[in-house]
């Protein structure tokens, strides 16, 4: 019997730092059916916390070294970084040169897992490959309309677009009047077994309880400044607790300064990025997500899998994940609403017990096999058109 030819798929990523998009890509590389697909990952920069998690059986194309492989001499490293930036700019202007030097095979499908890779994939000199894009962003909170329109127009050029939540696609039509007939909504895979396993790696002992944990990049729209003010207000009203935030980012110094000004250095813990955040989440009593915008955050499902009662702002695709009052609590995106929900968790044990019981259905809610099948069908069908 003649062996069926595998579909050759190239995933492009800028780098592989800790974050939602790289984690999704790594999961697909591990779990899409190898009997159907020949998978390759192409990194512009071989750097990031997740480098060690790249599957060994996956072909890897590296365009440029990461900082970790560079000289430890600051002067030499500075020169290396400048040269790297120049080479990357040349490759951006002349993608044919990049492919001639680095990409030795022709691929059937080239994938942009997020908007950062849109132009990389669309400018591929391989005109025969089908281009598939992913979009995970809630555009309603982006005030830079020209940037949003650029992304919207780039998405029209893909042979197929995958949106990470129904809301992510719908909001583009509602605000900008643009629809995507060649698209589908596929939720990101949430690896409940993985987060559960990693949660047992070590013990975490918080000094002040109960603890609200939270996890995300320290970006202004993630709402941590507001969360800190809510935390202070709860303490001032006699509700003892602490907050543990796992994540690094551009707002770290501002948050440290605010923490000092509010006098909550002992109770508002900034734990920075952690390669394994799950023991910190497991050791907490509740989880809070104060974001102004999200798409379909993996963290919500993973935390639910650890049976932690969740408070989240009612934004993006989160209402597609949390059933309000059943397996979590959804609140408006403002400090008063977050305050009232956190106060309720601290004072209403029956509510917390009910939400905790609701989280026990997480496995049924987030069925990963169904998602791998949906992606497989997209890749197979896009080649037929």
Region spans (language model):
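N-terminal strand-loop element at the rim of the active site
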Residues: 11-18, 31, 35-86, 175, ...
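Short hydrophobic beta-strand element within catalytic cores of glycosyltransferases
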Residues: 309-312, 322
């Amino acid at each position: 019997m003649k062996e069926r030819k595998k579909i050759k798929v190239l995933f492009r990523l800028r780098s592989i730092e800790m974050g939602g998009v790289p984690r999704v890509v790594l999961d697909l590389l591990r779990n899409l059916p190898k009997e159907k697909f020949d998978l390759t990952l192409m990194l512009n920069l071989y750097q990031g916390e997740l480098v060690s998690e790249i599957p060994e059986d996956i072909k890897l194309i590296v365009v440029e070294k990461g900082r970790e492989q560079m000289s430890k001499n600051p002067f030499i490293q500075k020169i290396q970084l400048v040269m790297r930036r120049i080479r990357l700019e040349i490759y951006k202007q002349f993608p044919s040169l990049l492919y001639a030097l680095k990409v030795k095979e022709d691929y059937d499908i080239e994938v942009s897992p997020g908007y950062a890779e849109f132009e990389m994939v669309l400018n591929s000199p391989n005109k025969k490959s089908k281009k598939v894009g992913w979009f995970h962003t809630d555009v309603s909170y982006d005030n830079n309309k020209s940037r949003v329109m650029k992304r919207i127009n780039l998405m029209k050029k893909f042979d197929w677009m995958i949106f990470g939540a129904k809301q992510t696609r719908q909001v583009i039509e509602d605000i900008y009047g643009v629809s995507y007939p060649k698209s589908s909504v596929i939720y990101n895979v949430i690896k409940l077994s993985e987060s559960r396993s990693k949660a047992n790696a070590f013990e975490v002992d918080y000094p002040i309880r109960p603890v609200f944990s939270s996890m995300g990049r320290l970006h202004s729209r993630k709402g941590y400044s507001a969360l800190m003010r809510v935390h202070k207000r709860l303490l001032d009203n006699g509700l003892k607790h602490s907050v543990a935030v796992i994540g690094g980012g551009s707002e770290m110094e501002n948050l440290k300064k605010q923490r000092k000004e509010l006098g909550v250095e002992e109770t508002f813990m900034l734990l920075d990025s952690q390669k394994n955040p799950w023991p910190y989440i497991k050791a907490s009593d509740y989880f809070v997500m104060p974001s102004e915008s999200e798409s379909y955050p993996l963290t919500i499902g993973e935390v639910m899998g650890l049976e932690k009662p969740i408070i989240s702002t009612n934004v993006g695709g989160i209402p597609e994940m949390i059933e309000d009052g059943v397996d979590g609590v959804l609140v408006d995106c403002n400090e008063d609403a977050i305050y009232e929900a956190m106060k309720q968790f601290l004072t209403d044990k029956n509510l917390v017990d009910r939400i905790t019981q609701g989280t026990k259905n997480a496995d049924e809610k987030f069925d990963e096999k169904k998602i791998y099948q949906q992606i497989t069908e997209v890749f197979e069908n896009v080649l037929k058109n």
